[in-house]
Design a protein with these regions (language model features):
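Short, glycine/small-residue-enriched coil/turn segments at secondary-structure junctions
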Residues: 65-101
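Histidine-centered active-site/metal-ligand motif
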Residues: 71, 112, 126, 162-164
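Polar/charged, compositionally biased leader and regulatory segments
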Residues: 1-75, 79, 186-204
Length: 204
């Protein structure tokens, strides 16, 4: 799918009132490496295009290679157990438990076709394991329907509880996983196929 077609669609998208996580539109924005949110506190979000220093695991920085530090999605920090809702009508593309240290943990990728000829995917990382139980490719969800919950640090790849939300215009052959962090030298390429999700999430 072309970036131009997506940009035309997203530019005309009207607010839906749907929040991927309850309270997102009242959330605090900011540069985030880590943000522990307790129950009852305002949730926090940020991270698209950030060049981050916290990715020290071998997954992101193999010895002798350029590290991956540029974040390709938006992180929404909320307590473990927070419900996750799809922003658009969707079908399950794939799911997987990515259990390397620092990885996504339980992950779901949804497929969206909001208008004829336009198809893209959204990735939801750091979920709880129960979110994947009984989930099959092709399972349909209506816009605003709950389909997952955030996982604890023990099951979400070792991170403070949060949702990694990412738009993917070119999924290729990927299933249940997709790069969420890019090398600086490849920044422009990856940001072109993983555009800023802010408008889809109803954020400024």
């Amino acid at each position: 799918m072309s970036r131009a077609a997506f940009d035309r669609w997203i530019s005309g998208l009207k607010p839906t009132g749907i929040e991927v996580i309850d309270g997102l539109r009242r959330a605090q924005a900011g540069k985030l490496d880590d943000a522990d949110v307790k129950p009852g506190e305002a949730i926090r979000f940020g991270g698209y295009g950030e060049d981050r220093t916290l990715y020290t695991q071998t997954l992101f920085a193999p010895e002798g290679e350029e590290p991956r530090t540029v974040h390709l999605g938006i992180d929404v920090f909320a307590p473990a157990g927070a419900e996750v809702f799809t922003p658009l009508n969707a079908r399950v593309h794939s799911s997987r438990i990515n259990d390397n240290p620092g990885d996504y943990g339980p992950t779901i990728i949804l497929e969206h076709t909001p208008v004829s000829g336009l198809k893209f995917h959204t990735l939801y990382g750091h979920l709880d394991r129960d979110s994947l139980k009984g989930l099959k490719p092709g399972t349909a969800f209506r816009a605003g329907e709950k389909f997952a919950e955030l996982g604890t640090k023990r099951e979400n790849g070792g991170w403070t509880p949060h949702l990694h939300f990412q738009i993917i215009l070119d999924i290729g052959s990927a299933k249940g996983d997709y790069p969420g962090v890019a090398k600086r030298s490849e920044r422009d390429h990856w940001l072109s196929i993983c555009p800023d999700p802010a408008k889809l999430l109803g954020l400024p």
